[in-house]
Regions:
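Positively charged, low-complexity intrinsically disordered leader regions
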Residues: 4-32
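Short aromatic-glycine motifs in intrinsically disordered, low-complexity regions
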Residues: 8-14, 156, 240-250
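Active-site-proximal beta-alpha core segment in soluble small-molecule metabolic enzymes
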Residues: 9, 13-16, 34-208
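Generic structural "secondary-structure junction" signal
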Residues: 17, 47, 146-151, 178, ...
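Generic structural motif
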Residues: 20, 118, 143, 214, ...
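Anionic-ligand-binding alpha/beta catalytic cores of soluble enzymes and soluble regulatory domains
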Residues: 185-255
Length: 255
């Protein structure tokens, strides 16, 4: 008689998302800066854009940032499907590089793209030369030393932008590398303000300014408020600093 094989069982772990705590965290963020670009990169930090986006839209959020084009298109599709009255009122920016074959799709879907070096600028302009308008965010490296134009490239960048007829600059932004280092943070802010002033002196039109991510927002409160705060981890209850900020946990594991 054939023996029965042992069965192996998987232990299922459920992740519960507390949407009320997302709302509470948003309130804490908006106590410092009312205008928020909600970062939904990495599928809303692993919690799922499908689950998180409706909560944020229902709380009045209308500006979102993603790492990649696929996530941005997903947001646009959810808005069309579930929030038809919000079509044309929800803005989405992509923080990372977009491949050439996806650029036209991005523009046609109203997705805003980030420019952070000259090679990329020239490539995007060449591919999109026949598009009516290109909405771009310009990222500057003020000390993070990862992505972005350097301060000494600002005037050259402005010269190039001035001859591009179909470009709309949605924002000038940067990112602070270490908010715990007060001296370095102040240096980065000073660089950023010098860059912005060069745009202003050259009468280059742009939309908004943003440099606050979650750590800068909670470390210095409203000291470095610009037009928007660009917030990800704080929305999801992740502490942006070593000290407690009073954010509410958003996820709970159910065994």
């Amino acid at each position: 008689m054939q023996q029965k094989k042992e069965k192996w069982y998987e232990m299922l772990i459920k992740l519960e998302i507390d949407t009320e705590n997302i709302k509470r965290n948003l309130e804490k963020i908006k106590e410092i800066n009312q205008n928020v670009i909600c970062v939904l990169k990495d599928d809303a930090y692993g919690l799922g854009i499908e689950s998180i986006l409706p909560v944020l839209i229902n709380e009045g959020c209308s500006y979102f940032a993603t790492a990649y084009i696929g996530e941005a298109l997903k947001i646009k599709n959810i808005v069309k499907r579930d929030f038809p009255d919000k079509v044309g009122k929800i803005s989405v920016m992509v923080l990372n590089y977009i491949e050439e074959n996806e650029l036209k799709k991005s523009v046609k879907n109203g997705i805003e793209i980030t420019i952070f070096n000259f090679e990329q600028l020239e490539k995007y302009v060449r591919v999109l030369k026949n598009e009516e308008r290109i909405k771009v965010h310009i990222k500057f490296n003020t000390g993070m030393n990862r992505l972005g134009f350097d301060e000494n490239e600002t005037r050259k960048l402005i010269e190039k932008i001035k001859v591009i007829s179909n470009i709309d600059i949605m924002s000038i932004y940067s990112h602070i590398s270490d908010v715990g280092n007060k001296k370095e943070t102040e240096k980065q802010i000073a660089r950023y303000e010098r860059i912005v002033s060069i745009f202003d002196k050259n009468e280059v039109k742009y939309g908004v300014k943003h440099i606050q991510a979650s750590p800068l927002l909670f470390k210095y409160r409203g000291k470095y408020n610009y037009d928007f705060a660009r917030v990800g981890m704080a929305i999801y209850g992740m502490e942006p600093l070593s000290e407690k900020t009073g954010l509410y946990p958003v996820v709970k594991l159910l065994l």
